[in-house]
Amino acid sequence: MVMSSPTNSARIILISGIASGQGKTTVTAALARKLIRQGLRVRVFKTGPDYLDPMILQRASGAEVYALDLWMVGLDDCRRLLARAASEVDVILIEGVMGLYDGDPSSADLARAFGVPVVVVLDAAKMAQTVGAVVLGLQQYGPVDLAGVIVNRLASPSHASMVTRGIRNVPILATLPKQQQALPERHLGLVQPDEIAQVDQVLDQLADQIEIDMVAWDAIAPVVLDGSLAAASTQQLLAGKTIAIARDAAFAFVYHANLECLRAAGAQLKFFSPLNDETIPAEADAVYIPGGYPELHCATLSSAQRWQDSMRAAHVRNMPILAECGGMMVIADSLIDAQGKKWPMVGLIPGEVAMQGKLAGLGMQSLATEDGELRGHAFHYSTLSTPVEPQAQTVKRSNGAHGEAVYKQGALTATYFHAYFSSCPAATARIFSPEIKA
């Protein structure tokens, strides 16, 4: 099965579905681990801005998982990321988002942009021959290159036989039986891999269970990707700067591309753990507290006095701080958890964060800056009540309405907006080094 391919060429498939909840992440993880067992070099990407699915996929594949989105990441950077991966591996799996044609841009748009064939995951738990009608509809709604179907949650051999009879003119690339142990979820999506008991055993079981039709697999032609493997030249606007980044189970929502962007701008990165009550590293010139699940760790964070004191001291010294989503939640005066208990927090911004019983912010957004448009997204279940007036607001891509508030307190920037740094490296650099001249 090992492929001898030209440079920037690999067997690439985009794994999509008719909706969320069909098992795309489960199937992609199972397929990645299975192919790696067979001696193939595999890289996985995730369509859209999600943080959690990539963590599972990274655990399954053993390699960093990057986001692909034609708007947030951009066409050129998507091409560069794919071409770089294709020069290094045999197989690229791209997990889509929502349904195949959902969103603007959709997973189908991404597949068409790079000539990538699509494989659709269908949850057959409550269907049989009707699966064929669904496949036919996806074909006709296109156009996409529909290279195959992966049928998930088959109950028995007879169920598989009925499903197979219903699908015409499209190969069944793989099948996966109903799983006894599914990947668990919570309010922001799948849980983080380290929270799943015996996660590697679960992933190995999925790899054992997925059955691949190697004839159908080998019929998928490699995709050749043109374009430079190098990122666009970035000014060394952060040369000589050290950025301290919170990284632990409470603050894990960081794009690998964001770290690359900071390094490309010349920054040195140092990581520390608020959950372990670690102080900001002494050599830090700026601090980044990213998003995550601080609401699940209120007691620990509220009692982490050494970390809290170091944050307050940095703020008093006017050290640049970016507190992003979950990061902003912990730098308010207090955080009210899902059970209604109030926990004292760092107090760099006056006000209170409270968990809500429903989604409080969602969608792709952009922030206009003096350096250009910084793109990203929001996805949160809490709200901030504060007397501080926002310095700016993001704009929702879907309708042009106001999105998330951006607060400034000295050199502190706080917002629910998750920025994709490479969409505007100069604006990103200015957050961490406000003295940069325009």
Curated annotation (Swiss-Prot):
Keywords: ATP-binding, Cobalamin biosynthesis, Glutamine amidotransferase, Ligase, Magnesium, Nucleotide-binding. One of its GO terms (molecular function) is ATP binding. Its EC number is 6.3.5.11. Residues 242-426 form the GATase cobBQ-type domain. Pathway: Cofactor biosynthesis; adenosylcobalamin biosynthesis; cob(II)yrinate a,c-diamide from sirohydrochlorin (anaerobic route): step 10/10. The active site is at residue 325. InterPro entries: CbiA/CobB_synth, Class_I_gatase-like, CobQ/CobB/MinD/ParA_Nub-bd_dom, GATase_3, P-loop_NTPase. Pfam families: CbiA, GATase_3. GO terms for biological process: cobalamin biosynthetic process. Belongs to the CobB/CbiA family. Comprises of two domains. The C-terminal domain contains the binding site for glutamine and catalyzes the hydrolysis of this substrate to glutamate and ammonia. The N-terminal domain is anticipated to bind ATP and cobyrinate and catalyzes the ultimate synthesis of the diamide product. The ammonia produced via the glutaminase domain is probably translocated to the adjacent domain via a molecular tunnel, where it reacts with an activated intermediate. HAMAP family: CobB_CbiA. Catalyzes the ATP-dependent amidation of the two carboxylate groups at positions a and c of cobyrinate, using either L-glutamine or ammonia as the nitrogen source. This is Cobyrinate a,c-diamide synthase. It comes from Herminiimonas arsenicoxydans.
